[in-house]
Design a protein with these regions (language model features):
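Hydrophobic alpha-helical hairpins/lids featuring a short glycine-rich hinge
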Residues: 87-147
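Short acidic/histidine-centered micro-motifs embedded in hydrophobic/aromatic stretches
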Residues: 57, 129-133, 182-189, 303, ...
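Secretory-pathway/luminal and periplasmic proteins that interact with or process carbohydrate-rich
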Residues: 62-64, 136-144, 189-196, 309-311
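Buried hydrophobic packing segments
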Residues: 39, 108-115, 130-140, 161-172, ...
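Hydrophobic face of alpha-helices
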Residues: 28, 32, 36, 108, ...
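Terminal-appendage/accessory-domain detector
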Residues: 1-101, 203-213, 220-457
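Amphipathic alpha-helical interface segments
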Residues: 107-110, 152-161, 165-171, 181-253
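Structural helix-adjacent loops and short alpha-helical linkers that scaffold large soluble proteins
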Residues: 118-130, 173-180, 228-231, 293, ...
Length: 457
């Protein structure tokens, strides 16, 4: 890509020529895994208080027939995408790209399934749009690295808005010029501050759904003739200027070999329902729990990457004593303490009961960190902990990769088992769930995506 080329124009040209049959089988398999996992994560949140809030507000805006996953009643297209995306991201159990901290599944899947229902899209077109959306979002994330977080914003929301717009534009078969307008419109919808880290409030959950519905809205506006700025990504007042570290970026990452090389193949299916970078430390603690007596632990020191500190470690006293269950998911010390005491970590681990458990809190307050300047985050997700016992002995535990990631992926049976476990938190019939699994893994064979959507009720 030359310095004179406009990023959105080049990207639109590349997206517009991608054919479903040219997407490699490995990417197709990953997209199917992400789709099933995303829906399962949304079903796990179906009976939550935040879902009730979302349903109540959508009913105030009128009715619709776009499916809300796990419920009989539907909603308008924007509310359905908002609810499904928010629910899917709600317990932080959703897939995450290994290489930068973005969650494409919970943005792209609800956007495309909602828009696909409205347009009666085929399974092939759905697969194409999903794959494009995942790829755009992961490539955008690789450009920004950790800078969006450092500026105080949530990359899943900011970058997801752009990616869902490209995915929806692909599903609508917009012309390149219309895609450029759609991206320009979407750029004004990018948002999502990370102040939720201070008190565990629900807004992080909302970010995925907001990005999903924004992509639908921006692409439909462009289709109807609305315009947006051409240099919305790389302009002097564009997205990267506003949300990252300026316009001097390597935009080649976004466009080089696009449609030929699919980096989103490295999307990880989460093994634990907590912030992604807590996972290697959880695995260290699961190892340690087999060997140590917690009553003999004086302190635990963790080697960490600097880019994770402001989200998962600081303020340390708050992270050691999280104010609610949601805040606990983004506390490495508390997640580690849960793993040490329970010898496992699942959705049931994050409850008021354990949040007030004195022994778990005592252990969490023994856990501290030191920055390792050689930690490869965000390129690799690793962990090393040093457990100092009252005898003076120090035991070391390490994890060299992310469970569920490219070096240790979950198998298809494991992904299905995770989906089935998440299903137990919803009211979806088992017969519908089994049909859904079959439909997702044969997605490109569906003549109409509404066949799949009917199984979601």
């Amino acid at each position: 890509m030359s310095s004179k080329e406009v990023v959105s124009v080049k990207l639109a040209e590349l997206v517009s020529v991608i054919k479903p049959e040219k997407i490699p089988s490995a990417m197709v398999s990953v997209t199917k895994n992400i789709t099933l996992d995303t829906i399962g994560c949304a079903l796990a949140a179906a009976k939550s208080s935040y879902t009730e809030s979302l349903l109540r507000t959508s009913q105030q805006g009128g009715s619709g027939n776009i499916p809300i996953w796990g419920f009989q009643d539907g909603a308008d297209i924007y509310s359905a995408a908002l609810i499904n995306g928010t629910n899917a991201h709600g317990e932080d159990f959703d897939s995450s790209f290994e290489g930068c901290p973005v969650h494409s599944g919970v943005v792209i899947t609800p956007a495309i399934l909602s828009l696909g229902h409205m347009t009666n899209a085929s399974g092939k077109d759905i697969m194409r749009a999903l794959s494009i959306g995942h790829e755009v979002m992961c490539r955008l994330g690789q450009i920004t690295g950790t800078t969006v977080h450092q500026r105080g914003f949530h990359p899943t929301s900011v970058l997801g808005t752009l990616a869902s717009t490209m995915a929806c534009s692909a599903l609508l078969h917009l012309r390149p010029k219309e895609m450029v307008n759609a991206i320009g419109i979407a750029a004004s919808m990018c948002s999502g501050i990370i102040e939720y880290l201070s008190d565990g409030s629900s807004t992080k959950r909302l970010h995925a759904g907001w990005a999903a519905q924004s992509g639908i809205r921006a692409s439909l506006l462009a289709q109807a003739g609305f315009t947006g700025p051409e240099k919305s990504i790389d302009g002097d007042h564009g997205v990267f200027f506003a949300f990252s570290n300026g316009t001097n970026q390597n935009y080649e990452i976004l466009t080089e070999d696009f449609g030929h090389k699919w980096i989103s193949i490295n999307t990880a299916i989460k093994a634990y329902p907590s912030g992604t970078m807590t996972h290697p430390f959880i695995d260290c603690c699961l190892q340690a729990s087999k060997e140590i007596n917690l009553n003999e632990v004086d302190k635990i020191i963790c080697d960490v990457g600097e880019g994770t500190v402001h989200r998962l470690w600081e303020p340390l006293k708050l992270k050691q004593n999280p104010p609610n269950e949601y805040a606990a998911k983004f506390s490495t010390p508390f997640c580690m303490a849960l793993a040490l005491h329970h010898k496992k970590l699942n959705l049931n681990s994050f409850s008021e009961l354990y949040l007030s458990d004195k022994e778990i809190i005592r252990t969490a307050n023994k856990i501290k960190y030191k920055i390792n300047p050689n930690d490869p985050y965000p390129k690799e997700y690793i962990a090393k902990i040093f457990v100092q016992l009252s005898s003076g002995q120090i035991k070391e535990y390490s994890k060299h990769c992310l469970k569920g990631g490219r070096h240790e992926p979950l198998s298809k049976p494991e992904i299905i088992a995770k989906f089935q476990d998440n299903l137990s938190y919803s009211s979806l019939k088992l017969s519908n769930a089994n049909k859904l699994i079959d439909q997702i893994y044969n997605l490109e064979e569906l003549r109409n995506i509404n066949q799949l959507n009917l199984s979601l009720r």
